[in-house]
């Protein structure tokens, strides 16, 4: 199988980060990476572009790490309260979504709903949760569900 060198323009899971030079199958590059704008073909003249991308990625990583540390300080150990409709037995009509938790956290810090880890919430009570703010930084908090 033929392999080709490509330069990633965006982070691709299980492959690399922006600015990395990686070897991939020619079909994967031609049919997925190039059309999606995730990579371009490697050339000797592209070394300057690689250096610029790596510099930009490093600067962004430092900024996002500092933002994540500030967000962790605001979120860590807090409790967010969410009101929901409940039956007489105390069970929720539906459940509490990660989007609802992210909205409740929005006054403390902006978080990605996909980064929130919490067990399935189907009753009222307190539930431990975690949010990944950065690959190295997570914050723990509690979700309190009360009857509406």
From Swiss-Prot:
GO terms for biological process: translation. Keywords: Ribonucleoprotein, Ribosomal protein, RNA-binding, rRNA-binding. GO terms for cellular component: ribonucleoprotein complex; ribosome. It comes from the Bacteria. The keyword Lipid metabolism does not apply. GO terms for molecular function: rRNA binding; structural constituent of ribosome. Belongs to the bacterial ribosomal protein bL9 family. This is Large ribosomal subunit protein bL9. It comes from Bifidobacterium longum subsp. infantis (strain ATCC 15697 / DSM 20088 / JCM 1222 / NCTC 11817 / S12). The gene is rplI.
């Amino acid at each position: 199988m033929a392999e080709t060198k490509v330069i990633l323009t965006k982070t691709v899971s299980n492959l690399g980060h922006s600015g990395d030079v990686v070897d991939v199958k020619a079909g994967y590059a031609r049919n997925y990476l190039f059309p999606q704008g995730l990579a371009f073909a490697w050339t000797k003249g592209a070394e300057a572009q690689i250096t610029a991308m790596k510099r930009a990625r490093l600067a962004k990583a430092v900024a996002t790490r500092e933002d994540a540390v500030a967000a962790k300080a605001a979120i860590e150990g807090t409790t967010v309260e969410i009101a929901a409709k409940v039956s007489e037995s105390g069970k929720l009509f539906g459940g509490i979504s990660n989007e609802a938790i992210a909205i409740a956290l929005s006054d403390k810090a902006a978080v990605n709903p996909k980064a929130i880890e919490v067990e399935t919430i189907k009753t009222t009570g307190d539930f431990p949760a975690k949010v990944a703010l950065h690959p190295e930084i997570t914050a723990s908090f509690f979700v309190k569900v009360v009857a509406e």
